[in-house]
Amino acid sequence: MVTTVQRTFRKEVLHALHKAKEVNHAVLISYSRQIESLDPLSFFNYGAKKYTGNRFFWSDPESELTIVGLGKEAVFQTNQKNSERYREVFEQWERFKKTAFHIYEEEKLQHSAVGPVLFGGFSFDPCEERGSQWDHFSEGDFFVPALMLTMTAEGPFLTVNRWVSGGEDAEAVLEGLKAFAAEFMVPDFKQEDQAVIAAAEELDKDDWLKAIETATSQIKEKQYDKVVLARELLLTFDGPIQIEPVLKTLLDDQQTSYVFAIEQEGKTFVGASPERLIKRDGGTVMSSCLAGSIKRGVNEEDDRRIGLELLNDEKNLLEHDIVVGMIHNAFVSSCSEVEKPDGPVLYKTKSVQHLFTPIVGQLRESASIFDLIEKLHPTPALGGSPQEKAVDVIREIEPMSRGWYAAPIGWIDSQDNGEFAVAIRSGLIEGSTARLFAGCGIVEDSEPISEYEETQIKLKPMISALGGERR
């Protein structure tokens, strides 16, 4: 467990240095303090030069919590091709916490997502034949940032993470940390003209439509119940794509979604997902069943009519029930108590309405958030049902490399609080190109053209964030 202290700053720096000398290797000091208001996008933009390729952005629905990480002070990685990848990251994190020191100035800094925080995500399927576009994205990639901004209802907090060795001078470490945190200022982010979409290509569209026909035939033959098939849109721009304007548009337009970005060696995976996979707050865990979708209406009356149509649509209700059942069973196996409502309600984003059922549980002491990620991913909303068979089908007939699309992405802090979203409504940006992804659930009576139109709707948030409709 991370040593968390509020006593005299100097004394605790000495404690950390003594520990480093005792174990004969460096330990991490994580120094947190409350600061004046600081814009998260400005902070993210500030890191573009010094920390380019090593930044992370996270904002939950309604921006109740925003976390921005710059640099990689500690890296946790796995290339395990099975479920052991979750345990490997968890065990690396547990070992790290044993020699990490969180030093803060005030009692109120004992806040979720302040101090040592692990950012990152996993691939959708570690056994897929990975496309080169996903180079540098491992089966699991996580890091503790060098600098971190945490925006909460209680205000903004800055965390500085630094390795120290037993031979360092305590006064130098002390003054260096305090001076950096006290004087930290960044220029305001200023919106610049974004590159313009020059070309758009729907990759393997015909193969994707044929895959739906194959899937519906197999489902009718009772080979499986459901599979989610995704497709890819390749956009080419007239210049390099800047990530900050993309994030700003997503934050402005997709306020009921998780907005995220993670950089890896010149590539940025970015998106606005409406779907929570798992959240842990103390002993309470929460997940969202989000399956079954339809477009928004042109006005309030039309929107209400379309929403009622979704709430009474047998295909979408069946698809939703499959997801609810799977998530509920996963919670029952890891929780002492589980609660879920009797039926779904509507969850509305700017472009899409979804059937939504929340599930809440009390996690057993022996379980971790990584245990639930392993049990939940991929849910039937992202893979299909039965889980293992659906993933096999995706490998066989889906004409794209998923990489991190539709996979868990999020954070966990030193107290094991954390949250992971499902990385949908997303895209992979590199230079002047953007690969956008969207999928839909295929069941027995799915129609290829109708499913294609559904993916068109789901692509809209990212197309808009990148500069508008295709030109």
Curated annotation (Swiss-Prot):
Q: One of this protein's GO BP terms?
A: menaquinone biosynthetic process
Quickly give the catalysed reaction. Answer: chorismate = isochorismate
InterPro entries recorded for this chain? ADC_synthase, Chorismate_C, IsoChor_synthase, MenF
Which EC number(s) does the record attach to this protein?
A: 5.4.4.2
What keywords appear on the UniProt entry? Answer: Isomerase, Magnesium, Menaquinone biosynthesis, Metal-binding
Per UniProt, Mg(2+) binds at 319, 454
Identify the cofactor(s): Mg(2+)
Task: Name the pathway.
Answer: Quinol/quinone metabolism; 1,4-dihydroxy-2-naphthoate biosynthesis; 1,4-dihydroxy-2-naphthoate from chorismate: step 1/7; Quinol/quinone metabolism; menaquinone biosynthesis
Active site positions, chain numbering: 226 (proton acceptor), 275 (proton donor)
Coiled-coil residues are none
Which molecular-function annotations from GO does this UniProt entry contain?
isochorismate synthase activity; magnesium ion binding
Q: Identify the Pfam families for this entry.
A: Chorismate_bind
Q: What class of enzyme is it?
A: isomerase
Q: Which family does it belong to?
A: Belongs to the isochorismate synthase family.
Q: What does this protein do?
A: Catalyzes the conversion of chorismate to isochorismate.
Protein name in UniProt: Isochorismate synthase MenF
Q: Which gene encodes it?
A: menF
